[in-house]
């Protein structure tokens, strides 16, 4: 049954992927190539020159590139050119000229042009700047409006280079903002903004390093904000490397597409596609300590190669999937918010590892296809199994999912140290499931929903075969696991609870032997709680009671901000909840504190020791 569902889902996903692969990359490449050919044909009238007499054209003025231009008034400002360093300086010029195809045209393919900006400069014409190897720098800014062609372009089939280290704003009404048959680099705190019909940046490979902001919007059908394609013979890989920069990308097709791989380190990337994918690569996707907000019609973020993300935040929203990786997926200490309408919010074809972090995954199951919130499927090449889908959750990961079905995999699901809450409508976990060696269940509750959930026997949790009475039948399931202590370790009431400590391990050790030993867990935690809580204080049964007890014991301090939780009506509890979240002793989801939320005793110990660490 599961295999049939997965087969249908895989077929639908493959169809969507084929649509994307057959349209977004090739179709855009075709449209871009056609555009470049169209532009090239129009430009031939001015670019077929004697190579020995290279020219620099600025508006309707033509200059020999071997001759200096002493400071000269032009367009309300001044220009100058140093023939030895090939440096053109614009100082406050405003040039509007439609007599040529390019406002600035540097036709020397073998010589780089250094463009230095001073003051505010404006160029308006059929096309903006054409130069095969161009570096833009200086303390000034440049605004380009191109009515027919690109804002900035190279010529030829390869070897082009563009480096931008100053503020540039481009409007390309009927072309790409930037089209370079080679490498593009944006650096030095530059701000680059563009609104264009076709691609925002179309190049072979891309580096954005320490840019203040790169804001690109493509308005044309079937176009990308960033399109990194590599060269035709494969000598230059189509890779994008983003470091410590802010990107805001909007387009019809994938807002951020790089053929052979994407690497993002630091900064923030916001990518939105109206009919395809927010961020996509056919290669590997590597993200470190960055904030990602990706949304698309098919899915928010995806790759054909493996995806690995360490640190940072990931928001991924799509019609079919939030995160869709056709390979292995590893998330290390990432704060994830993934949502989809139809299928799986977080999906991989191959091993998936969720190590630490906070993960929220919501599948609305609009497809009616018994969708999971998180699922690791097998990866095939025809009938050949390339990689088994397995799911591992560990590293004290906090996972909250909702959907028709909760979490699972085609292979083995393994749970290490984790806090997993599943609010599904059908089945919470797909078999087979195991607890990772060295870990045990600390708390287990389940039922048809959260309100009716009851304490369950941990011995009933692990199963390795289909069983209608297995614990996964509970649509709601909340499991908390932790490490096991050594045989000689015992709880220390003065030490309090720490999931990684001997005391925490000891609590875990007595919590795993069925109902009788579960009673041992109850005794152990009560002993610890009565030793650390104020004398005569009742053990809190929910989050609201715990927040009030912590706040009252701390002396009822005023929170820094006004209480703003929508689900807390009592004024004192509202202040307590606000103060506890501000101090980091308790967490909350958005504007909801969930004051009635069940709190296990070991969690009370953990929060108490955060609020009042032992001196």
Please report, for each region that a protein language model flagged, where it lies by residue:
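Residue-level detector of short, conserved catalytic/binding motifs and their immediate flanks
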Residues: 17, 113, 134, 544, ...
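Feature responds to low-complexity, polar/acidic, surface-exposed segments characteristic
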Residues: 2-7, 21-40, 486-575, 582-605, ...
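Short alpha-helical scaffold segments that flank and stabilize functional sites
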Residues: 193, 364, 400, 550-553, ...
């Amino acid at each position: 049954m599961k295999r049939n569902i997965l087969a249908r889902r895989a077929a639908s996903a493959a169809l969507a992927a084929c649509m994307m692969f057959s349209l977004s990359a090739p179709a855009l490449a075709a449209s871009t190539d056609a555009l470049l050919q169209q532009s090239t044909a129009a430009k031939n009238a001015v670019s077929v020159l004697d190579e020995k007499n290279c020219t620099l054209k600025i508006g309707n003025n033509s200059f020999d590139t071997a001759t200096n231009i002493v400071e000269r008034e032009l367009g309300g400002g001044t220009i100058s050119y140093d023939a030895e360093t090939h440096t053109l300086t614009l100082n406050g010029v405003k040039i509007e000229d439609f007599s040529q195809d390019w406002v600035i045209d540097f036709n020397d393919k073998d010589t780089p042009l250094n463009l230095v900006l001073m003051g505010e400069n404006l160029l308006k014409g059929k096309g903006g700047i054409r130069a095969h190897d161009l570096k833009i720098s200086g303390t000034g800014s440049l605004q380009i409006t191109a009515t027919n062609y690109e804002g900035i372009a190279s010529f030829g089939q390869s070897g082009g280079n563009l480096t931008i280290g100053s503020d540039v704003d481009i409007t390309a009404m009927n072309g790409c903002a930037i089209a370079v048959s080679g490498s593009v680099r944006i650096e030095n705190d530059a701000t680059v903004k563009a609104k264009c019909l076709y691609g925002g940046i179309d190049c072979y490979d891309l580096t954005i390093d320490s840019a203040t902001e790169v804001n690109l919007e493509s308005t044309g059908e079937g176009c990308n904000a960033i399109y990194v394609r590599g060269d035709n013979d494969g000598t230059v890989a189509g890779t994008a490397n983003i470091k410590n920069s802010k990107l805001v990308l909007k387009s019809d097709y994938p807002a951020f597409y790089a053929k052979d791989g994407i690497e993002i380190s630091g900064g923030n990337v916001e990518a939105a596609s109206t009919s395809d994918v927010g961020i996509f690569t056919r290669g590997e996707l590597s993200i470190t300590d960055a904030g990602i907000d990706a949304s698309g019609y098919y899915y928010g973020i995806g790759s054909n190669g493996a995806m690995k993300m360490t640190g940072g935040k990931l928001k991924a929203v799509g019609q079919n999937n939030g995160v869709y990786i056709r390979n292995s997926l590893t998330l290390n200490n990432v704060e994830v918010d993934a949502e989809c309408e139809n299928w799986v919010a977080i999906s991989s074809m191959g091993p998936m590892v969720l190590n630490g972090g906070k993960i929220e995954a919501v599948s609305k199951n609009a497809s009616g296809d018994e969708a999971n919130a998180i699922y690791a499927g097998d990866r095939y090449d025809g009938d050949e199994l390339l990689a088994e889908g397995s799911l591992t959750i560990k590293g004290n990961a906090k996972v909250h999912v909702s959907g028709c079905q909760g979490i699972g995999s085609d292979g083995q699901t393994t749970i290490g140290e984790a806090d997993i809450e599943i609010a599904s409508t059908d089945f919470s976990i797909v078999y087979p499931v195991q607890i990772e060696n060295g870990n045990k269940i600390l708390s287990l509750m389940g039922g048809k929903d959260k309100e009716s959930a009851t304490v369950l026997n941990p011995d009933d949790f692990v199963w390795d075969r289909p069983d209608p009475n297995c614990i996964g039948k509970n649509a709601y399931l909340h499991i908390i696991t932790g490490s096991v202590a050594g045989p000689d370790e015992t709880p220390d009431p003065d030490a309090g609870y720490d999931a990684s400590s001997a005391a925490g391990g000891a609590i875990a050790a007595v919590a795993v032997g069925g109902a009788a030993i579960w009673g041992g867990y109850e005794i152990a935690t009560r002993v610890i709680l009565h030793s650390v809580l104020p004398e005569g204080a009742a053990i809190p049964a929910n989050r609201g009671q715990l927040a009030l007890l912590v706040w009252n014991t701390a002396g009822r301090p005023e929170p820094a901000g006004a209480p703003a939780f929508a689900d807390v009506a009592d004024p004192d509890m509202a202040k307590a909840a606000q103060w506890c979240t501000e101090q980091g002793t308790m967490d909350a989801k958005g504007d909801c504190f969930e004051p009635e939320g069940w709190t296990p005793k070991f969690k009370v110990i953990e929060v108490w020791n955060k609020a009042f660490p032992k001196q």
